[in-house]
Regions:
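TOPRIM fold recognition
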Residues: 52-160
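Phosphate-handling DNA/RNA-contact segment within nucleic-acid enzymes
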Residues: 1-94
Length: 160
């Protein structure tokens, strides 16, 4: 299990893995019917935010990887290869009907790097689509927040 908090004892935000947890078992929103597609996110909040932006569509699996480990932006990125995520490997083993992977990582260096790595690793066996947020540096949570603020503003203007 992945732990994330606003503040630690020093007043800084923190992220950590719960001791003894198993990355194979990750947050997943199943489709209401049958589906051959899985959308893959860095975090569960991204999956829920993207689902909100898609008006609650339940036509695909939405799987969180519980974070990604990317190299720092710079020279090292060309040589480092990403390990296949345990959560996605286990999911695909358990769902052989899945033929399409939609990569919905963040649109920052780490997310773009992970998207390219995962596409390369899975495109021989699956149809792989990169679906990053259109805004540079954003994740789907940022876009959902923007959409909510826009909706509030429009409602306020109509109420005048």
């Amino acid at each position: 299990a992945f732990l994330r908090g606003i503040y630690d004892s020093r007043g800084k935000s923190f992220r950590m893995e719960q001791e003894g947890s198993n990355k194979q078992y990750s947050f997943c929103v199943p489709p209401l019917g049958k589906s051959h597609r899985v959308a893959v996110y860095e975090a569960c909040i991204d999956a829920l935010a993207h689902m909100t932006l898609e008006d609650g569509r339940t036509d695909k699996y939405r799987l969180s990887l519980g974070g990604i480990a990317a190299p720092k932006e710079g020279a090292e990125r060309a040589t480092k290869k990403m390990k296949r995520p345990d959560a996605l490997e286990y999911f695909l083993k358990e769902h052989p009907e899945v033929t399409e992977i939609e990569l919905c990582t963040d649109n920052d260096f780490a997310g773009r790097w992970a998207c390219a790595q995962l596409k390369e690793q899975y495109e021989e066996k699956y149809t792989v689509v990169c679906n990053l947020p259109q805004m540079e540096g954003a994740d789907y949570g940022d876009l959902a927040k923007q959409a909510g603020e826009k909706q509030k503003k429009q409602q306020k203007e109509r109420g005048r």
